[in-house]
Amino acid sequence: ENVGAHTLVGEGVGARAAQADPLANPTTEADDIEIFGYLGTKSTAASPGDSAKQTAVKVNNLTGETGVKAYAKTYASIESTSAEQKTYSVKINGFTTGNFVISSGDVESAVDAINQVSGSTGVTASSSNNKIVLFDSDGDDITVENLQTLDGFSDLRVSKLGEDGLVSNVVG
């Protein structure tokens, strides 16, 4: 008999450097997700560009046949590498924040600005150790674009976070 709860945490694709056309997740049409549950085993196709949310939906469509239920959450962080306070604006999932001031020792203005657009982005922000922690509870991808184009404004670093909050990939 199979009794108990099992958790599989997949860290997914790391943060990517800025570019005109974002990269899709590195899967091919031939990739399958195999689901081994107490009710049975099933496979579902993984598609290029699937978010964690889309993958969880595919797994959950087979819950009745496998007994496996999936959830998806997405975490990322933004930090400034400059001790000097600078004014930025960013796009989160295509929605522009208001201007905020950020430094390596102060992120509260940025957290407030990001949370002002959270109803549109699905991403909430909090602060931890002078970093902005971004969270999407549905597992949608989180995109961040620095809108400040002046010289000397390249201090923001975006990192992919695992569910444990630890940095697993840095871009910037």
Regions found by a protein language model. Give the residues of each.
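Long, low-complexity, repeat-rich, intrinsically disordered, solvent-exposed domains used
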Residues: E1-G172
